[in-house]
C-alpha cells in the first residue's frame, strides 16, 4: 500500500494565516493612519482658526474703541462750542436789545430773550463742564480697556491654540516648531500696531478734527446790513479746536467792519460787538485758527481770550493703537502658524485595535509589525485680512486701519519657507516639508 504524507497542510496553513494576519494588520494600520492624520490636520485647522478669530476680535475691538473715543471727542468739541457760543450770546443780546429798544413789540421780545438766555447760560455752563469731565473720564477708561485687550492678546492667542488642541484630543500638542511659531507671532503682533501717545497723537487728533460737525469746526458768516453796498458789514467768526492735544478751546467773535473812508479804503474791524470763549483741559499758550477769528476779528479775539470760561475736566486726548508705520506701507497682518504633533506610541493603530503586533513564521518565531513614523505632524495657518462686508457706495477702496472694524479670520496656505522652517526646528525630513 502507498504511504501517505502527513503534516504538509499545517505548514501551508501557517504561511497562509501569517499572510492573512499581516494583510489585516496593515489594512487596519493604513486606515487608522489616514483617520489619525485627518484628525490631526482638522485639529491644527481648528486651533489656527480659533486663534485667528480672537486676533480679528482684538483688532475689531481696537477699531470700535477708537471710534468710540473719536465720538466722545466730537461730543466734547460740541459741548465746548456750545459754551463758547452761549457766552457770546450773553454779550450779543444786551446790545441787540439796545438797538431794538425803539421798535414796538420787538423791544419787549428782545428783553425777554435777554433775561431768558442769561438764566439758560447760568445753568448751561456748569452742566456742560460736568459733562465734559465725565465724557473725558469715560474715554480714558475705554483707552485703558483697549490697552489691556491689545497687550493681553499676545498671551491669549497661544493659550487658545493649546486649549483648542487639548479640547480636540488630549494626545495632541504643539511641536517644538509650533511653540517657536507662537513666539514669532507674539513679536509680529506687538509690531503690527503702534501705540500713539504723547506728540504722536497727531494721528488721532487729525481724525477727530475731520469728524467734527460744521457748528463745532467753523462758525462763521458775513452780514451786510446795507444791502447792495459794501460800506459796512458784520463779520462773525468762530470755531473749536483741540490745542496741544490736551485742551479743547472754542472762540466766537462778532465785529463791525467798515472802511477807513466813506467810499475808499479796505473793510477792517472797527468795533467788537460780541465775543465769548470756552476751554476744557490744561491751560495752553498755543492758539488755533478758530474760524479765522484772530485774523478777521483781532480786537474781538483778544477780548474773547480774556473772557474764556475754563474747565479743567478734560484729561487730554487719549493715546490709542493704530497700524504701525511699517504696516501702513506694506500691509501684512500677523500669520498664526500651528504645527501639531502626535507620538506614534500614543496613536490608536492596528496594535491597539487588533490586539497584536506580530505574526508567526515557519521558523516558529514572531515577525513584528511596526508603523513607519515615530511622530506624526500636521500644520495649518490663519490670518486676519481687512475686508469690508460690502463695497463702498462711492467705489473707493478703503485702506486698512484700526478705525474700521472690518477684520476677518481666514485659513490660508503655508508657504514653502514656513514649512521648511517648522520642519527644520522639529527635525523632520525637509523633502516632506515642501509638500502641501
Where does each model-flagged region fall?
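Long, compositionally biased low-complexity segments
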Residues: 70-436
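Alpha-helical assembly-interface signal, strongest on the long, hydrophobic N-terminal helix that forms
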Residues: 1-84
Amino acid at each position: 500500500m502507498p504511504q501517505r504524507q502527513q503534516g504538509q497542510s499545517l505548514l501551508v496553513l501557517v504561511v497562509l494565516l501569517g499572510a492573512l494576519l499581516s494583510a489585516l494588520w496593515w489594512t487596519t494600520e493604513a486606515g487608522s493612519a489616514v483617520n489619525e492624520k485627518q484628525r490631526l490636520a482638522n485639529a491644527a485647522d481648528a486651533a489656527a482658526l480659533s486663534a485667528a478669530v480672537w486676533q480679528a476680535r482684538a483688532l475689531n475691538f481696537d477699531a470700535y474703541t477708537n471710534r468710540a473715543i473719536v465720538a466722545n471727542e466730537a461730543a466734547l468739541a460740541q459741548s465746548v462750542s456750545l459754551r463758547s457760543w452761549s457766552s457770546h450770546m450773553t454779550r450779543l443780546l444786551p446790545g441787540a436789545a439796545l438797538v431794538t429798544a425803539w421798535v414796538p413789540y420787538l423791544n419787549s421780545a428782545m428783553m425777554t430773550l435777554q433775561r431768558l438766555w442769561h438764566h439758560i447760560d447760568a445753568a448751561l455752563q456748569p452742566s456742560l463742564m460736568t459733562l465734559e469731565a465725565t465724557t473725558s473720564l469715560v474715554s480714558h477708561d475705554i483707552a485703558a480697556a483697549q490697552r489691556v485687550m491689545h497687550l493681553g492678546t499676545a498671551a491669549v492667542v497661544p493659550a487658545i491654540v493649546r486649549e483648542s488642541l487639548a479640547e480636540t484630543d488630549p494626545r495632541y500638542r504643539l511641536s517644538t516648531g509650533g511653540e517657536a511659531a507662537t513666539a514669532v507671532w507674539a513679536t509680529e503682533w506687538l509690531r503690527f500696531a503702534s501705540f500713539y501717545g504723547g506728540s504722536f497723537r497727531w494721528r488721532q487728533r487729525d481724525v477727530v478734527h475731520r469728524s467734527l460737525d460744521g457748528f463745532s469746526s467753523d462758525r462763521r458768516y458775513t452780514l451786510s446790513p446795507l444791502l447792495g453796498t459794501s460800506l459796512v458789514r458784520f463779520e462773525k467768526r468762530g470755531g473749536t479746536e483741540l490745542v496741544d492735544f490736551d485742551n479743547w478751546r472754542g472762540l466766537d467773535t462778532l465785529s463791525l467792519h467798515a472802511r477807513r473812508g466813506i467810499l475808499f479804503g479796505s473793510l477792517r474791524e472797527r468795533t467788537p460787538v460780541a465775543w465769548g470763549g470756552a476751554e476744557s483741559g490744561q491751560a495752553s499758550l498755543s492758539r488755533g485758527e478758530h474760524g479765522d477769528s484772530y485774523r478777521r476779528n483781532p480786537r474781538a479775539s483778544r477780548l474773547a481770550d480774556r473772557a474764556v470760561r475754563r474747565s479743567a475736566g478734560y484729561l487730554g486726548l487719549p493715546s490709542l493703537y493704530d497700524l504701525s508705520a511699517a504696516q501702513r506701507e506694506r500691509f501684512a497682518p500677523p500669520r498664526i502658524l500651528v504645527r501639531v504633533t502626535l507620538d506614534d506610541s500614543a496613536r490608536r493603530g492596528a496594535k491597539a485595535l487588533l490586539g497584536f503586533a506580530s505574526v508567526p513564521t515557519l521558523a516558529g518565531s514572531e515577525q513584528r509589525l511596526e508603523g513607519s513614523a515615530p511622530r506624526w505632524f500636521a500644520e495649518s495657518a490663519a490670518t486676519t485680512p481687512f475686508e469690508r462686508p460690502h463695497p463702498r457706495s462711492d467705489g473707493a477702496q478703503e485702506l486698512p486701519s484700526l478705525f474700521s472694524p472690518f477684520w476677518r479670520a481666514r485659513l490660508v496656505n503655508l508657504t514653502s519657507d514656513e514649512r521648511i522652517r517648522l520642519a527644520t526646528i522639529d527635525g523632520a525630513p525637509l523633502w516632506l516639508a515642501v509638500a502641501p
